[in-house]
From Swiss-Prot:
Gene3D superfamilies: Fe(II) trafficking protein YggX. This is Probable Fe(2+)-trafficking protein. It comes from Hydrogenovibrio crunogenus (strain DSM 25203 / XCL-2). GO terms for cellular component: cytosol. The keyword Nucleotide-binding does not apply. Keywords: Iron. One of its GO terms (molecular function) is iron ion binding. Signal peptide: none annotated. InterPro entries: Fe_traffick_prot_YggX (IPR007457), Fe_traffick_prot_YggX_sf (IPR036766). Belongs to the Fe(2+)-trafficking protein family. The keyword Acetylation does not apply.
Length: 90
């Protein structure tokens, strides 16, 4: 049976994640309030941020930056602006 959540990002009831994306309170909050679709969108946005800003997942500053951006993206009710250097491939 598919688990449904009232997704805060998409503002509708959608299929939820299968498990919290990481441990702790924030992971549980995401599990309870974010759909698979919204999480997929965040992962795409995160990839752009990592590539455009040349972030290292081992750098604590980069980890904090991504965590803040994730919270804005998922719970802030706003889409994030793309980095200035970003050029979408058509």
């Amino acid at each position: 049976m598919t688990r449904m959540v009232n997704c805060v990002k998409m503002e509708q009831e959608l299929e939820g994640l299968d498990f919290p994306p990481f441990p702790g309170d924030l992971g549980q909050k995401i599990y309870e309030n974010v759909s698979k679709e919204a999480w997929k969108q965040w992962l795409a946005q995160q990839t752009i941020l990592i590539n455009e800003y040349r972030l290292s997942s081992l750098d604590p500053k980069a980890q904090n930056f991504l965590k803040e951006e994730m919270q804005k993206f998922l719970f802030g009710g706003e889409d994030l602006e793309m980095p200035e250097e970003f050029q979408a491939i058509d």
